[in-house]
């Protein structure tokens, strides 16, 4: 276990020693051993969603946002070819998808929700019925700015019934919350190496329905982000088109091996759910309220209301918690002051209890009066 501060963030995460050790070797990007790692990763990622035989895994260099942009740019035809994206918005990462569509020149329709409201399948149904020109829906599964969980399966069935394509940003859910391609129809699920799989950042991937991907030649605005070209080239050569992040790929391979050894999705999701319960309960005991009701809270990252005290200031709070070995995340809401605490990654021997204790001691040091303070 690392002696560095533990990252209680939505990614990057604190990784295992085994994952760190995997990055100590250098790899040739065209070497057959490295190509075997890429092939193994692609199969393992498909296995998580039961997509073998129906879907393709296309990895891409860069942060998760690179892969979201690549998915939209590749799967959604340009406006002159009729592409039109509906983006329901209940947080910052939904807004980012809408911005991507605007920058790429894809026709865009948005539908706005409050930051603490789930996206409703009945709204998607009504919007698709109202405007048949919409070709795709782009949905954030777990909105990282709050931790809200949107009803992916129900929305996917609505989108399928209307004959449209669904692109899912699953950055903060993939590997911990169920997405089953056999039951939940989608054209693409997009995720990245540095979240619930507990790799390091630097690589995204798109799990695309093969039949949808096969129709995408010539759609993309970009050479580097063309998932169709990347897919065809990888299948032909077993290699990446451009220099891959070799150490990141090796780390994800090691992390994915550990993921399956530890019990896969059920075990990872269960561990995060336990962390989440202990976090919310522990901070509630200090008088800190979570932003979302439990029914719509994903066990990935939790947003808390900042203490209602003039003595509270986030930077001082952050530094005090950091001195005690934990790194938090600022809030990302527009209406109220908040901070965020992640439930992912390697939390050390004391687990979430150590983080709760660090928050308690930090707030006491700042002179805040706490509920149930010892």
Curated annotation (Swiss-Prot):
The gene is phnW1. GO terms for biological process: organic phosphonate catabolic process. Involved in phosphonate degradation. The modification N6-(pyridoxal phosphate)lysine is found at residue 195. Belongs to the class-V pyridoxal-phosphate-dependent aminotransferase family. PhnW subfamily. It catalyses: (2-aminoethyl)phosphonate + pyruvate = phosphonoacetaldehyde + L-alanine. Its EC number is 2.6.1.37. Its cofactor is pyridoxal 5'-phosphate. Gene3D superfamilies: Aspartate Aminotransferase, domain 1, Type I PLP-dependent aspartate aminotransferase-like (Major domain). Homodimer. It comes from the Bacteria. Keywords: Aminotransferase, Pyridoxal phosphate, Pyruvate, Transferase. The lineage of its organism: Bacteria, Pseudomonadati, Pseudomonadota, Betaproteobacteria, Burkholderiales. GO terms for molecular function: 2-aminoethylphosphonate-pyruvate transaminase activity. It is an enzyme of class 2 (transferase). Pfam families: Aminotran_5 (PF00266). This is 2-aminoethylphosphonate--pyruvate transaminase 1.
């Amino acid at each position: 276990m690392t002696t560095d501060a533990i990252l209680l963030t939505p990614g990057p995460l604190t990784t295992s020693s085994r994952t760190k050790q995997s990055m100590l070797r250098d790899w040739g990007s065209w070497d057959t051993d490295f190509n075997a790692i890429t092939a193994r990763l692609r199969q393992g990622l498909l296995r998580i969603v039961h997509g073998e035989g129906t879907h393709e895994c296309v990895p891409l260099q860069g942060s998760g946002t690179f892969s979201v942009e690549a998915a939209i740019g590749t799967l959604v035809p340009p406006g002159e070819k009729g592409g039109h994206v509906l983006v329901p918005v209940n947080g910052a990462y939904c807004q980012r998808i809408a911005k991507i569509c605007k920058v790429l020149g894809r026709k865009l329709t948005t539908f706005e929700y409050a930051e603490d409201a789930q996206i409703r399948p009945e709204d998607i149904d009504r919007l698709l019925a109202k405007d048949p020109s919409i070709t795709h829906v782009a949905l954030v599964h777990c909105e990282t700015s709050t931790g809200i969980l949107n009803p992916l399966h129900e929305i996917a069935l609505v989108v399928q019934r209307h004959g449209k394509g669904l692109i899912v940003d699953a950055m903060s859910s993939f590997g911990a919350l169920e997405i089953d391609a056999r039951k939940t129809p989608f054209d693409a699920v997009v995720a990245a190496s540095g979240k619930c799989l507990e790799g390091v950042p630097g690589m995204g991937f798109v799990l695309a329905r093969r039949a949808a991907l096969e129709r995408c030649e010539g759609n993309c605005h970009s050479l580097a982000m063309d998932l169709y070209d990347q897919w065809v080239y990888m299948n032909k050569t077993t290699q990446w088109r451009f220099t891959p992040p070799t150490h990141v790929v090796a780390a994800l391979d090691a992390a994915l091996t550990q993921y399956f050894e530890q019990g896969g999705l059920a075990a990872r999701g269960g561990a995060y759910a336990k962390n989440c319960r202990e976090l919310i309960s522990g901070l509630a005991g200090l008088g800190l309220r979570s932003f979302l009701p439990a029914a719509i809270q994903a066990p990935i990252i939790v947003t808390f209301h900042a203490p209602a005290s003039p003595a509270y200031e986030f930077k001082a709070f952050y530094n005090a918690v950091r001195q005690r070995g934990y790194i938090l995340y600022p809030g990302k809401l527009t209406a109220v002051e908040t901070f965020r605490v992640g439930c992912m990654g390697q939390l050390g021997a004391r687990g979430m209890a150590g983080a709760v204790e660090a928050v308690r001691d930090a707030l006491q040091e700042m002179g805040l009066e706490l509920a149930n303070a010892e």
